[in-house]
Curated annotation (Swiss-Prot):
Family from the record: Belongs to the quinolinate synthase family. Type 1 subfamily.
Its EC number(s): 2.5.1.72
Catalytic activity entry: iminosuccinate + dihydroxyacetone phosphate = quinolinate + phosphate + 2 H2O + H(+)
Record-linked InterPro entries: NadA, NadA_sf, Quinolinate_synth_A_type1
Name of protein: Quinolinate synthase
The gene coding this protein: nadA
EC category name: transferase
Residues binding [4Fe-4S] cluster, per UniProt: 125, 212, 309
NCBIfam families: nadA, PRK09375.1-1, PRK09375.1-2
Organism, scientific name: Burkholderia ambifaria (strain ATCC BAA-244 / DSM 16087 / CCUG 44356 / LMG 19182 / AMMD) (Burkholderia cepacia (strain AMMD))
Biological process annotations from GO: 'de novo' NAD biosynthetic process from L-aspartate
Keywords linked to the UniProt accession: 4Fe-4S, Cytoplasm, Iron, Iron-sulfur, Metal-binding, Pyridine nucleotide biosynthesis, Transferase
Compartments, record wording: Cytoplasm
GO molecular function, one term: metal ion binding
Cofactor remark: Binds 1 [4Fe-4S] cluster per subunit.
Length: 378
């Protein structure tokens, strides 16, 4: 049984300088600065981070120069699980989150006493938009016997309705544990990730029908053709991708797991099915290896892979400097919602820490890594 919701409609901004992402999603993207402007902005941002005693937390999908700034200033470039941990544990009282809104909300939930800023508060997520809190709450009310598990890519209000929050790096293990205890599950919002976990674990899951507009655009037929061009390439796939893409993967995993695979696998070429922003970190982690973007369009298209989130692209040097200078674009979460939303997040973090210790104690790294190895790998 699966839920159904109306497709998300995205409004095109009327201002100039916008960009079309994929799936007809539009976002106001900062103009690219010149080389001189870029150098000046970076210097200004570094000075402002020091002045404000702030730390920059960036996701793998934001532009390379923001990732570089985070690394150079003692911040963090990571997936959403590590971003959550880092922001919670860092001494800085001001967190600047370069990513999309749910990441800023999660940082605020875990650090309610800290100031959380974002370059652009309109940077959202199709998974978040596709799972309105009121509709999801009604769906949960209709199935009161089920444990509610939600993906990190959701609003604070949706997290507050959940029993567990998960990220792609730990979701499979958590669902497997719940299934072993005989629990039936409501999963939201990504249908592809939910279906993948359902097949790997055999869990009884009702799937909310959301999707990531970037990963949903990857094409199985075109990927098969690209693999024929690069027969020795390993295929790295994020599990938010459609089933016919996941089925061709050598490795299925979170952003961090895909980067690790690029480093550890004995291959020189990799086809990567996730947001193009990750290629910066892959190239740094595995110099000398070649990374090829998986196709999101057919042979007749002028752009074979447009796999970059338009909302991630809203994070730029200029608006990052501006938010540090002015102290605006602060994230606020209703305290009552924040308290409830923290419970499923803390459950995930505690589970992840305990799971890591179990794996390290057993020394069975191969078993752990194979949790995200695709059973139908080519």
């Amino acid at each position: 049984m699966q839920s159904t919701i109306k497709p998300v409609e995205y409004d095109r901004p009327v201002a100039a300088g916008t960009v079309c992402g994929v799936g007809q999603a539009w976002a106001k993207v900062p103009d690219a600065p010149s080389a001189e402007e870029r150098a000046a902005l970076k210097a200004r941002i570094k000075a402002l981070l020091a002045r404000e005693k702030a730390v920059l937390v960036a996701h793998y999908y934001v532009d390379a120069e923001l990732q570089e700034l985070a690394d150079e200033t003692g911040g963090c470039v990571a997936d959403s699980l590590e971003m959550a941990r880092f922001g919670r544990d860092h001494d800085a009282q001001t967190l600047v989150v370069a990513g999309v809104r749910f990441m800023g909300e999660t940082a605020k939930i875990l650090s309610p006493g800290k100031r959380v800023l974002m370059p652009d508060l309109d940077a959202t997520c199709s998974l978040d938009l596709g799972c309105p809190a009121d509709e999801f709450s009604a769906f949960c009310d209709a199935h009161p016997d089920r444990t509610v598990v939600v993906y990190a890519n959701t609003s604070a209000a949706v997290k507050a309705r959940a029993d567990w929050m998960v990220t792609s790096s730990i979701g499979l293990e958590i669902v497997a544990d719940l299934h072993a205890r005989g629990e039936k599950i409501i999963w939201a919002p990504d249908r592809h990730l939910g279906s993948y976990i359902q097949k790997k674990t055999g869990a009884d899951m009702l799937l909310w029908q959301g999707s990531c507009l970037v990963h949903d655009e990857f094409k199985g037929i075109e990927l098969d053709l690209l693999r024929a061009e690069y027969p020795d390439a390993k295929v790295l796939v994020h599990p938010e991708s459609p089933e016919n893409v996941v089925a061709q993967a050598d490795v299925v995993g979170s952003t961090t797991q895909l980067i690790d695979a690029a480093v550890k696998l004995d291959a020189t070429h990799f086809i990567v099915a996730t947001d193009l922003g990750i290629l910066h970190k892959m190239q740094l982690a595995a110099p000398g290896k070649t990374f090829i973007a998986a196709p999101t369009a057919g042979n007749s298209a002028t752009c074979k892979s447009c796999a970059h989130c338009p909302w991630m692209a809203m994070n730029g040097l200029a608006n990052l400097a501006d938010v540090l200078e002015r102290g605006h674009n602060e994230i606020f979460v209703d305290p009552a919602i924040g308290v409830r939303a923290r419970l499923p997040i803390d459950r995930m973090l505690d589970f992840a820490a305990a799971h890591k210790k179990r794996v390290q104690a057993s020394g069975d790294l191969q078993r752990d890594q194979q949790l995200f190895a695709n059973v139908g790998a080519a």
